[in-house]
């Protein structure tokens, strides 16, 4: 067995601290750089003050670990703060220098930036570390929890500087993002002030986190990383179970396409893919049955009725859409919503003359798979198997390795010479997870998942949630989103949950800005 060096996830950034030369005042808003922008909203001129600053004392990626604070002239001390994340694929986290562009005219109804400026909201964006970062001195510092830690540090920066900010209420922070950004937004909203993140926050010099004499970490009052609410789209969350969830939902669809020859992955042996699919689907059954989630009537959600629960959520969105745009337009949507020419309704949604309808989830899944080719199996953790460009494995692992499989199947079947997996450690997934290194990996996985923190319930969970996932979006399993919706709706700390599927939306976000920001305005 090859000997490998493994370290705790909580010390991923420790090595860079000794070389940091930034001083305490680097996270003081008073030292930020200011630029005056002139934009317009619906043709009306508006001045915006743009501030740029460091948000941590010890950055190891200083070109990205920067924060933008945009304050329109109509903002006040009571204005909410819209906190924008990027994080596409857990990769696209570089510092954005054009969240608000000088001279641009914004739409004050359908553009989220335009709405924020029109209403006098403070807009914040930032850059952070990601799994795509090059190693620093041979160490991979972009693994989990780096992205979450940096995001929390940026939020802490705002609270640390509450008295210096010209406008904006730091207790009214709403975080928003799409896809990986949706996942990041939801996990931040679910894990407010969780001690899980204190060590990594301390190591980068985030505001308000101290190391006590007894070796424990603490957070100062008034410098927390909790948020008031979240607007999230298609969150790629619960990664530890996402591969299994994908095959549990799409396994039968995949088998039909395999038999009919409609499934084509030129770089994968289809027999290997189908074997992986079956094994992963079985794992998800065990996971679902262990959660103890309940529906609105108090009935336990299990592997035998979860599809019925998903279908019920789809019915809710179909009913809403019927009342909003009507049956005729919906039928047109079904046939025109295609990337490969005209699509034919395969009977997944059929309306009767009197206006009633029948919905078939299995046919709906096939319809979705015709729209966009299904991800391979495993869908998210497969770098050590047969796919090198469609996975999230580089989000995990110690700083000594470029990536790590993050579920049982991918670990046990890893084939690459990479220092991880059963082939290199000699340990099965279950055996490895009993080790100190395995527990560190489990914590890394947890720190990317809103569901884990919602079910645990010990953090300062955001009280307001607006989350959507498109009915034509196959980038993660409908099961993952259904469980997320359920965990949000049944959490006692959540005051308002506006969650659900979105009529025939693909993998995308911010398609319902008027609705989402109307919801936000009612809360405020």
Outline where the language-model segments fall.
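Non-catalytic, alpha-helical, charged scaffold/linker segments
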Residues: 216, 232-237, 241-382
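C-terminal subdomain of alpha/beta-hydrolase-fold enzymes, centered on the catalytic histidine
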Residues: 326-524
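Primarily recognizes the serine-hydrolase "nucleophile elbow" in alpha/beta-hydrolase
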Residues: 160-252, 445
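Hydrophobic h-region of N-terminal signal peptides that target proteins for export
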Residues: 10-18
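Alpha/beta-hydrolase active-site loop
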Residues: 141-164
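Cap/lid segment of the alpha/beta-hydrolase catalytic domain
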Residues: 85-148, 191, 505-506
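Short beta-strand element of the alpha/beta-hydrolase
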Residues: 67, 78-90
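N-terminal cap/lid segment of alpha/beta-hydrolase-fold proteins
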Residues: 21-77, 436-447, 456
């Amino acid at each position: 067995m090859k000997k490998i060096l493994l370290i705790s996830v909580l010390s991923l950034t420790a090595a860079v601290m000794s070389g940091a030369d930034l001083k305490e005042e680097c996270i003081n808003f008073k030292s930020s750089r200011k630029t005056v922008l002139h934009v317009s909203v619906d043709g009306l001129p508006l001045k915006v003050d743009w501030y740029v600053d460091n948000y941590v004392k010890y950055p190891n990626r200083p070109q990205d670990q920067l924060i933008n604070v945009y304050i329109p002239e109509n903002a006040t001390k009571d204005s909410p703060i819209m906190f924008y994340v990027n994080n596409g694929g857990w990769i696209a986290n570089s510092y954005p220098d054009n969240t608000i562009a000088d001279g641009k005219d914004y739409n004050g109804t359908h553009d989220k930036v335009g709405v924020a400026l029109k209403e006098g909201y403070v807009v914040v964006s930032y850059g952070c570390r990601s799994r795509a970062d090059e190693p620093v001195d041979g160490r991979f510092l972009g693994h989990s929890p780096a992205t979450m830690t940096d995001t929390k540090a940026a939020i802490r920066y705002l609270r640390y500087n509450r008295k210096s900010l010209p406008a904006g209420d730091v207790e009214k922070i709403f975080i928003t993002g799409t896809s990986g950004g949706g996942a990041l937004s939801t996990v931040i909203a679910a894990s407010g002030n969780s001690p899980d993140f204190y060590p990594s926050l301390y190591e980068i010099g985030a505001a308000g986190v101290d190391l006590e004499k007894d070796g424990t970490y603490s957070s100062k009052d008034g410098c927390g990383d909790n948020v008031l609410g979240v607007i999230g789209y298609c969150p790629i969350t619960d990664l530890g179970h996402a591969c299994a969830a994908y095959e549990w939902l799409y396994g039968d669809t995949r088998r039909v396409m395999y038999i009919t020859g409609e499934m084509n992955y030129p770089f994968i042996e289809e027999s290997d893919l189908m074997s992986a699919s079956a094994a992963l689907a079985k794992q998800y059954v065990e996971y679902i049955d262990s959660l103890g989630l309940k529906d609105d009537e108090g009935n336990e959600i299990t592997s035998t009725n979860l599809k019925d629960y998903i279908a019920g959520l789809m019915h809710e969105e179909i009913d809403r859409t019927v009342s909003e745009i009507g049956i005729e337009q919906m039928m047109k949507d079904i046939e025109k919503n295609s990337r490969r020419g005209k699509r034919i309704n395969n009977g997944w949604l059929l309306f009767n003359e009197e206006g009633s309808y029948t919905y078939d989830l299995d046919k709906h899944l096939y319809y979705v798979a015709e729209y966009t080719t299904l991800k391979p199996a495993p869908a998210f953790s497969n770098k050590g198997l047969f796919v090198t460009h469609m996975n999230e494995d580089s989000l995990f692992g110690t700083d000594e390795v470029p990536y790590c499989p993050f579920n049982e199947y991918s670990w046990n079947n890893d084939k690459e010479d990479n220092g991880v997996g059963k082939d290199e450690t000699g340990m099965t997934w279950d055996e490895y997870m009993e080790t100190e290194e395995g527990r560190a990996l489990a914590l890394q996985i947890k720190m990317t998942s809103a569901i884990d923190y919602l079910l645990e319930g010990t953090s300062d969970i955001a009280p307001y949630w607006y989350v959507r996932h498109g009915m034509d979006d196959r980038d993660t399993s409908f099961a993952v989103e259904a469980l997320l919706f359920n965990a949000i709706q049944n959490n006692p700390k959540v005051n308002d949950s506006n969650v659900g599927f979105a009529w025939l939306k693909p993998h995308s976000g911010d398609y319902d800005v008027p609705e989402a920001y109307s919801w936000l305005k009612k809360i405020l």
